[in-house]
Amino acid sequence: MVNSIRKAIVLIFIAAGFMTLSAQTGKGLLVGKVMSETGRVLVGAKLFVTGSQDSGVTDVEGKFSFAVPVGARKVFVEAAGYDVLEDSVMIELDKEFFLNPVMSTISRMEGVEIVKRKKPKENTVAAAIQTKQLSSGMVEAISAEDFAKTTIRTTSDAIKRIPGATISEGKFANIRGMFDRYNAGYLNGAPLPSTESDRKAFSFDVIPAALLDNIVVVKSATPDMIGDFGGGIIQINTKSVPEKFIQTASIGFQYNSITTFNTMDAFGLEGSEYLGLPSAKRNIPVLDPKMGFEPHTTSKDPALNARETLKFNNDWSLKKVNVMPAPRFSYSLGMPFKLGKKEAGLLVSWNYAISPRRSEGNIVSKDYSTNYTYKDFSDEILSTNVQNGGVVNLSVKLNKKNRIDFRNLLSLTYDAGSTLRSGLTDADNGMYSEGFSNQVNFNRLVSSQVNGLHSFGKDKSKLTWVLNYGNTYRAVPDFRIANYALPEGDIANRQLVLNAFFNAGTGRFFSYMNETNVSASTDYSYNADLGKTHHVFKTGVFAQNRVRDFQSRQFVYAPVGGFKPSSALPEQDLGASAISASNIYLIEKRSEERRVGKECA
């Protein structure tokens, strides 16, 4: 009996010991805000707590929050240029302890030698925070570290994550609610050429995020900026040359439950299209200038038109496309080396991704007051995006105060889409329709720059300069549409629509836009202390030259102005075997004035 009582007492003490140990090993939360004596929030201040391996770092608002073991603890706060602050706290289990340290500036430093000042890497969150802190204007920044935490694939995806910036049409940036034409885009400090034929805008989906270090959005004007914007400036910076040898490679596959391993009818990709380059089959052949054209509805020489039509790629066949998981590859190599006695570095980075996407939609136009339906048709779409690009950057440090960078970027973006449409398109006339379309958009961006950075005196004066060459090429090669009409939905009366309107009939469209931008800029800044205040004086010069060329050609199938009975698919109705002077042929849709101008040239 006595032994049993002793055992029970021992077990009680052991249990109490475990309970005490459990309570001591629990954690509470230490939260607060670090500020200076002048009321300035301190970004990047570090907090250390005795008895804990955890530490905290303040964010862009000077705030911190991290878990700390319970009990009496000492907190040490460190910030560059300020005395180390020590304070005592009592942390309770699962409770918050608020601490708002106020830091005092270092008034005197004796016997201190600064061995090395380390700058945050440009692709880190710390560098993005520092950019925002040190800027004289209102800026937001996002870094490659942020890219890795999300599903960001393109520059437009990254811009969506920045406060005050939105993306329209999946690629154009709106800053502070202002449309793309009022904003400016810069790549490594040089202006980006426009990718649009009818407006000043850049399509940000053509640059893969894997090739970038960071993106900075400037939302307010400062005297040292070029005044060609109203909303903001988007500054894109490609990967910089590393200080030590690095080599990274990644491979991944994307699965989509709606798309992957599903089979659908589509025009598909072939050959070089998998690399992001248009197939040569999509080019416009060299045509006889006597080929018929608008406003005539028929050719003066149908036999000639038929022969010219046979020069095109007349393969309209649909293929059974089985969508496989989407692959993604990336590779980066960075290495420092000696160029004579000069320090130099090289960075080579390549990114490739292909992303198919299947979607279905239903479009209904209805008067709900009378319950009358004007239109009711469905679309089945298979779109494929191919991104292929890379950067090659070289940096040469002439000495401690002079550096020259060579930055080069090539980006290829290829979007191919197949759309199959069916349903009611005109209720007033009882017209049902079937449509087949194949559209491709190709974008190529080439950017080459030489940048210089020079410091003078005790780093009070800085001179930077940029020589830039940029080129964008955008093409819509062989956009095809075939439309069929079914009066009252009767399949027996199915007809191929032939009219003078490409988008409402049957035809082909080609367009090419090429813009070259050459620019040069130089900026000078001088730092001066006047009394107790610090001032920065800046001045600069900028010049650029833009040259743009745009061409488009539209073809419709003739004889124009009627319907051709058909129960077949486009591959039979518009294939090479169907082309003849007595059956069907292409006619170029152009104005009479343009025709005369070309004949006289």
Across the structure, where does each feature detected by a protein language model lie?
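Periplasmic N-terminal accessory/gating domains of Gram-negative outer-membrane beta-barrel systems
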Residues: K119-E122, A126-N174, G189-P223, G230-I233
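Transmembrane beta-barrel wall of Gram-negative outer-membrane proteins
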Residues: T298, L310-T419, V446-S448
